[in-house]
Amino acid sequence: MAPKKKVTGLIKLQIQAGQANPAPPVGPALGQHGVNIMEFCKAYNAATESQRGNVIPVEITVYEDRSFTFALKTPPAAKLLLKAAGVQKGSGEPHKTKVAKVTWDQVREIAETKKSDLNANDIDQAAKIIAGTARSMGITVE
């Protein structure tokens, strides 16, 4: 078994799927850890090609020999809610002004997608977490 590599950094970014490039925010974040930026961009774009149009969070683990591994997460709940509601952005004053409505079925569908990243034991709990996010964005859940 190979000796374990020493981790020197953990970088968390949210990048459009299939559109990572060396420009900010990707370049500076990776550059300060000495990672080969183009190598990451090519690997990320290849891994997220099928999900174009979504923002995909990524966790990059950097090792002392400047190599890296990355793990893709599910799109942020807020982005999925905006897409389901068909609006560009949430409300500026969420508890006064409501901008859209989503059904419980849509919330459950988003919860199914996000299940692996949420701290919930079953779909009902996950749906409540997503509904809370919707409420704080000024989206009504019916």
Curated annotation (Swiss-Prot):
Pfam assignment, any one: Ribosomal_L11_N
Signal peptide (residue range): none
Domain of life of the organism encoding this protein: Bacteria
Post-translational modification: One or more lysine residues are methylated.
InterPro entries linked: Ribosomal_uL11 (IPR000911), Ribosomal_uL11_bac-typ (IPR006519), Ribosomal_uL11_C (IPR020783), Ribosomal_uL11_C_sf (IPR036769), Ribosomal_uL11_CS (IPR020785), Ribosomal_uL11_N (IPR020784), Ribosomal_uL11_N_sf (IPR036796)
GO cellular component: cytosolic large ribosomal subunit
SUPFAM superfamilies linked to this entry: Ribosomal L11/L12e N-terminal domain, Ribosomal protein L11, C-terminal domain
GO terms for MF: large ribosomal subunit rRNA binding; structural constituent of ribosome
Biological process terms in GO annotation: translation
UniProtKB keywords: Methylation, Ribonucleoprotein, Ribosomal protein, RNA-binding, rRNA-binding
Function: Forms part of the ribosomal stalk which helps the ribosome interact with GTP-bound translation factors.
Subunit details: Part of the ribosomal stalk of the 50S ribosomal subunit. Interacts with L10 and the large rRNA to form the base of the stalk. L10 forms an elongated spine to which L12 dimers bind in a sequential fashion forming a multimeric L10(L12)X complex.
Family to which the UniProt record says this protein belongs: Belongs to the universal ribosomal protein uL11 family.
Name recorded for this polypeptide: Large ribosomal subunit protein uL11
Species this protein is from: Mycobacterium sp. (strain KMS)
Lineage: Bacteria, Bacillati, Actinomycetota, Actinomycetes, Mycobacteriales
Name of the coding gene: rplK
